[in-house]
Amino acid sequence: MKLKYTNKINKIRTFALSLVFVGILIMYVGIFFKEHPVIMVIAMILGFLAVIASTVVYFFIGLLSTRAVPVICPSCEKQTKVLGRVDACMHCDQPLTMDRSLEGKEFDEAYNSPASKKSQT
């Protein structure tokens, strides 16, 4: 079974979107506790904090996205952004690398860790 690799930017955006939905769900659950104001307020505050956390994550990924290197994917020929030494295409999940020493090797996200970079040299 082959693992499906996805783009790092898309992973973080998906996490931020899930934080929005989780926050709204927590606030919605808080409505069911109208008779218990303390529980309702705690649920509303936790939900609000989850939505605020998603805003922070979206801001962070926006900053990262501006630093990512735009490349043209050789498979789908669409522009995508590469974060780190290895990443996947945003459109077709094709493994991509910016490091010539990794060309032709099996795709592994561990190549982005500093320990892996030291062991390669």
UniProtKB/Swiss-Prot annotation:
Signal peptide: none annotated. The keyword Transport does not apply. GO terms for cellular component: plasma membrane. It comes from the Bacteria. The chain crosses the membrane at residues 14-34, 41-61. The keyword rRNA-binding does not apply. Pfam families: DUF2614. Keywords: Cell membrane, Membrane, Transmembrane, Transmembrane helix. InterPro entries: UPF0295. Belongs to the UPF0295 family. This is UPF0295 protein ABC1323. It comes from Shouchella clausii (strain KSM-K16) (Alkalihalobacillus clausii).
